[in-house]
Amino acid sequence: MGYESMLADIKSSLNGKISDVEDKIEKLKKAKKDIDTLQEEAITEIKEIVKPELGKHWTGTKADDFDKGREEAKSEASKIVNDKYNEYMASINGKIFDLEWDKAKYASELFIANGAADLLKKGEEFAEEVGNTISKLKWW
């Protein structure tokens, strides 16, 4: 396989990897937005747990127990929503960071491959340098 076709394969593969990573990043960003929306909805619903306020006819230990139960439910639901939200967001942000890092690596490899292709266009006297550049590419 000649250098020209080898570089074409390398560049095609790297462009494909960059595209795949970009798709994954976009899906994760959409998931973040969806989770934000769900959290906002959950927070609104959690506020409803303690509504309506008990009227003046609700008194005594049964009313106190009922109110206490609603407050505990609200507190527990808030804890779950906020803890899970933070956990999911941290996980998604970490994955996005990893993918951005991968994208940068692929882009730098593509830059090197494009440089090698430019050298190849200069003529046969640069063939050895092109071969050395190709061998430096991490993915090949």
From Swiss-Prot:
Lineage top rank: taxon: Bacteria
Xref: InterPro entries: YwqH-like (IPR031681)
Database matches in Pfam families: YwqH-like
Coiled-coil stretches: 6-51
Stated name of the protein: Protein YwqH
Disruption phenotype: Deletion of the ywqH-ywqI-ywqJ-ywqK-nfi operon has no visible growth phenotype, however it is out-competed by wild-type cells.
Keyword annotations from UniProtKB, A to Z: Coiled coil
